[in-house]
Regions:
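C-terminal accessory segments enriched in acidic
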Residues: 25, 159, 163-387
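Phosphate/oxyanion-binding active-site loops and adjacent basic polyanion-contact surfaces
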Residues: 28-32, 54-60, 95-102, 181-185, ...
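Short beta-strand-to-loop junctions in surface cap/lid or active-site-entrance loops
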Residues: 64-80, 90
């Protein structure tokens, strides 16, 4: 019956479209895989196509593209250290436009980076168009086992908005799985994300046009988001460019709850379109996703600002002056003995320097590993000039200036 309805919808879209309108077909799983491989191959110096695992029922590859400047020359350690934005699609297999959004964003970043390498400098993008290949092929929300993969993640698993009964195609449901993280697709995605220095995680879905928070912050089961100042700032900036508003999620155990809760990344579902199962759009795919792609661009182009981001303004032998230019607060700031618990956005502070390193946390939420948000910066090695050691930068500068003045005066005396 569902496929009959699909044919009817196809006919309706084709015949109802105006002559000036394009009717564009969405990718299938096979064409998405082929086009993604081809896209990565066009940019061999900055992109690598890889396969992370195999789906539960049809043994289909869960494939990704990794993007970084001079990526083939980077060690695994260097690659994993880069601030990273991760984008995925089709946790729900019948939400084809979510895969399209992921693919188009990947395409945009590759094209811009090829034209201007600075667009990619110092950061990493990873894109997985389809987390649920079986559902993508079968046009089903659930995976082969009838599990809603976006209710299967360990963080807050089963708390609300889930079912304890499997749902097989064509029936859609919210079955959370037999246990948290029970599904192969979920496990593959989590393991993949653990190899990233995640700053931002966007999981694309369809069914509405808005942004979904990692967990409920209002009503029953509400839990505060520790880094809400950062979330609120980003969401306001996003609304300015995309017009998208935000809301609480409908269920627990979602991938973004795990992305923020376990991996300490700014994690959001982007509901890119209200269409779910139709294989066509009555406009261009890019046109339908234009506002959502602006939100992706915003996050990517400001990736290092997602959280606290301290900039050194001045440094002497015994102090360092810093400004937080990030979109969130910085925490536990120290250059030795003294610790400043919080530095607000745009705040300037001067702290004592008893070390050659500056350290701080760019988020207050830690995640499953204590050092996930830890930032370390090298400071200039300068000792106290009063002890006869290496003078400060300011002292050296003043000495050179004085020497220049004396030399100039002597020359003037000779000339006179």
């Amino acid at each position: 019956m569902k496929y009959v309805l699909t044919l009817v919808a196809l006919a309706f879209l084709v015949f109802s479209a105006q002559p000036s309108e394009a009717v564009e077909a969405l990718h299938t799983y096979d064409s998405m895989k082929e086009d993604t491989q081809e896209l990565a191959s066009q940019y061999p110096e900055i992109a690598i196509y890889s396969e992370q695992g195999i789906s539960t029922g049809l043994d289909l590859e869960i494939f990704s593209v990794d993007v970084a400047l001079n990526i083939t020359e980077l060690s695994d350690e260097e690659l994993h250290a880069l601030p990273t934005m991760y984008v995925d699609g089709t946790h729900h297999g019948n939400e084809g436009m979510s895969a399209e959004a992921s693919f188009l964003f990947l395409q945009d970043v590759l094209q811009r980076s090829a034209a201007d390498p600075s667009y990619l400098e110092g950061k990493r993008l990873v894109v997985t168009p389809s987390v649920n290949p079986d559902g993508y092929v079968l046009d089903c929300r659930s995976n082969w086992n009838g599990v809603d993969l976006n209710r299967n993640y360990p963080y807050m698993w089963g708390m609300y908005g889930t079912s304890d009964t499997p749902n097989f195609c064509p029936v859609s449901g919210t079955y959370r799985g037999a246990s948290e993280g029970s599904e192969i697709e979920t496990q593959v995605n989590m393991e993949f994300m653990r190899n990233m220095n995640l700053y931002v995680y966007f999981s694309a879905h369809t069914g509405s046009n808005d942004i979904v928070l990692p967990w409920k912050i209002t009503g029953e089961f509400a839990v505060p988001i520790a880094d809400w100042e950062l979330y609120e700032y980003f969401l306001n900036e996003s609304a300015n460019v995309s017009g998208l508003t935000y809301r609480d999620p409908g269920g627990a155990g979602e991938s973004i709850a795990w992305g923020y809760g376990a991996r300490a990344a700014l994690s959001l579902i982007v509901e890119v379109d209200d269409m779910q199962w139709s294989p066509l759009v009555s406009t261009t795919i890019r046109g339908a996703l234009s506002n959502e792609l602006l939100m992706y661009d915003l996050a990517w182009e400001n990736l290092e600002l997602v959280g606290g981001h301290l900039q050194i303004i001045d440094e002497t032998y015994n102090s360092v002056t810093l400004q937080n230019i990030g979109w969130g607060a910085a925490y536990n700031v120290t250059a030795g003995n003294e610790i400043v618990e919080k530095v607000e956005r745009n705040q300037i502070i001067t702290i004592p320097k008893n070390s050659n390193f500056l350290q701080y946390n760019r988020l207050i939420h830690e995640g499953e590993e204590a050092d996930l948000t830890l930032i370390s910066m090298n400071l200039t090695s300068i000792q106290n000039p009063e002890n006869g050691d290496t003078p400060s930068i300011g002292f050296i500068s003043a000495s050179l200036t004085l020497l220049a003045i004396v030399t100039s005066r002597k020359r003037n005396d000779y000339n006179n």
